Structures are given as structure tokens and as C-alpha cells.
Swiss-Prot record:
It is an enzyme of class 2 (transferase). Coiled coil: none annotated. Its EC number is 2.3.1.117. GO terms for biological process: diaminopimelate biosynthetic process; lysine biosynthetic process via diaminopimelate. InterPro entries: DapD_Trfase_Hexpep_rpt_fam, Hexapep, Hexapep_transf_CS, THP_succinylTrfase_dom1, THP_succinylTrfase_N_sf, Trimer_LpxA-like_sf. One of its GO terms (cellular component) is cytoplasm. This is 2,3,4,5-tetrahydropyridine-2,6-dicarboxylate N-succinyltransferase. The lineage of its organism: Bacteria, Pseudomonadati, Pseudomonadota, Gammaproteobacteria, Aeromonadales. Keywords: Acyltransferase, Amino-acid biosynthesis, Cytoplasm, Diaminopimelate biosynthesis, Lysine biosynthesis, Repeat, Transferase.
């Protein structure tokens, strides 16, 4: 792995001079191998190590180099054609392979090569970009989008129209992460490398970026860039210092643990926000 990383890091420093026709065969092979490993879930753009999320920047570099070494080509899709540098993940899948990997893909869901879809995941008509990871047993609902390099945990439900932001550049920016057992309500957006902690419930129409104030009404604490585990979050507002107006905020109305979630439905949690 260290040799692969060294080749990618070195090539990235010379990326402006790399074209599909001029790329060194060793670099091409290293990039393609990295994308194949991403596609198979053997490596990830980010992973949790000792309780902290670690971003593997060299993997993001490989994704960016993948665009430089490929020409656009015609891709066959559901009833139409596409013209792009990244092939579709399931282009060469057979019925046997779908069964072996135990995933369900509903047309016209679009998944780019270099993303990983774990066992028992369900993709309704949705979009999953290169470098993304969708965990075991998760559902990506209708018109939801999983951006480049976004990390979706196990048993997550991304409801209809949800947007999970992608990030390739700037290189130092971290990916958006939805941890295990989260529920993201319809038409919500989580972007700019925000981390939603395990077991959280995000209500419909909540928008969270790095500058969004995430207000915990129980403690009065304001978070940025991270929703604490087990949070139930709704749209809200906070007054300005002068008191003349209010600005948007995401509001943590309560905290729940796994035991509570197993006994109480999502809708019940959201209906009882004044409890």
C-alpha cells in the first residue's frame, strides 16, 4: 500500500502535466488499482480509527488523477447514452453478481465506478458519486444524492431528495460523514464535511453546513460541523445579539439512545419534541 500511495502522491504533484495520452503507465496502473480497491470496498477515503475519523488524502488524490488520465467516452444507460470520464459501476454486472453482493438497484439509479455499495443496501432512483461509501443495510431513497467521497454508515436511511455533499477539492477538506443507524429526513442537506453522529435523527428539511449553528436546547451549547451521537434535530432559528431578527439554525431538541430508538418509531420521536 505504501508504494501505491507514494506513486499517487508523486504523480499528484505533477498533475497539471498529466493527460490521457502522456500519463506514465506506472501512474495509470496505480490510479486504476486504487479506484478498483475503492470500488470493492478494500480501501476508503475516510475510516474511523480509535474513535476518530481519519481521511486518506492520497485516495482523494487518486480520484482526482482518475479524471486526468481518462478521456470522455460514450456510456450506455437506461434508455439513453451518457458522455463522461467515469464509467458506471454496474455496467458489467451479471444477475449472479448482484445476487452475490446482495444489493438492490432500482432504475434509474446511477452509481459511478469507484464507489462502494455494501451488502443488503437498497438504491432507489438516486445518485452515488465516485469515492462514496454506502454501508451495509442502508437505503438511499428516491432522488437522494450521495456526493463524491461521502461516507454513509450501516443501517442508514437517506430519505427522498436528501443531499449528502461531496468533496474532492480543496484537498484538505474532509468528506461528509453519516455514521451508523442514522435517519436523514426528506429534502434535508448535509454538506461541507459535516459529521452526523451515530444514531441521530435529522428531521425533514434540515440544512447543515460547516457554518450552520447546531443548537442544543438542553445544554445551550452550540456545535459547528458535527451533530453529536443520538441527537434528534429539527429546523429552527436563533435570535441575533441585537434581538431585531432571527437566523436559521439546526436545533437538537432531544437525545436518544439505541434502546429508545429500538422501541420508538422515527415519527414518534419527531412528534414528541416538546416532551
Amino acid at each position: 500500500m505504501s508504494d501505491l500511495q507514494h506513486i499517487i502522491d508523486d504523480a499528484f504533484e505533477r498533475r497539471d502535466s498529466i493527460t490521457p495520452n502522456s500519463v506514465d503507465p506506472i501512474v495509470r496502473e496505480a490510479v486504476l488499482q486504487t479506484i478498483d480497491m475503492l470500488d470493492a470496498g478494500q480501501i476508503r477515503v475516510a475510516e474511523k480509527i480509535a474513535g476518530e475519523w481519519v481521511v486518506h488524502q492520497w485516495v482523494k488524490k487518486a480520484v482526482l488523477l482518475y479524471f486526468r488520465i481518462n478521456d470522455n467516452a460514450v456510456l450506455q444507460g437506461a434508455g439513453t447514452q451518457y458522455y463522461d470520464k467515469v464509467p458506471l459501476k454496474f455496467a458489467d454486472y451479471t444477475p449472479e453478481r448482484f445476487k452475490q453482493e446482495s444489493i438492490r438497484v432500482v432504475p434509474p439509479a446511477t452509481v459511478r465506478k469507484g464507489s462502494f455499495i455494501a451488502r443488503n443496501a437498497v438504491l432507489l432512483p438516486s445518485y452515488v458519486n465516485i469515492g462514496a461509501y454506502v454501508g451495509e443495510g442502508s437505503m438511499v431513497d428516491t432522488w437522494a444524492t450521495v456526493g463524491s467521497c461521502a461516507q454513509i454508515g450501516a443501517n442508514v436511511h437517506l430519505s427522498g431528495g436528501v443531499g449528502i455533499g461531496g468533496v474532492l477539492e480543496p484537498l484538505q477538506a474532509g468528506p461528509t460523514i453519516i455514521e451508523d443507524n442514522c435517519f436523514i429526513g426528506a429534502r434535508s442537506e448535509v454538506v461541507e464535511g459535516v459529521i452526523v453522529g451515530e444514531g441521530s435523527v435529522i428531521s425533514m428539511g434540515v440544512f447543515i453546513g460547516q457554518s450552520t449553528r447546531i443548537y442544543d436546547r438542553e445544554t445551550g451549547e452550540i456545535h459547528y460541523g458535527r451533530v453529536p451521537p443520538g441527537s434528534v434535530v429539527v429546523s429552527g432559528s436563533l435570535p441575533s445579539k441585537c434581538g431585531k431578527y432571527s437566523l436559521y439554525a439546526a436545533v437538537i431538541v432531544k437525545k436518544v439512545d439505541a434502546k429508545t430508538r429500538s422501541k420508538v418509531g422515527i415519527n414518534a420521536l419527531l412528534r414528541s419534541i416538546d416532551d
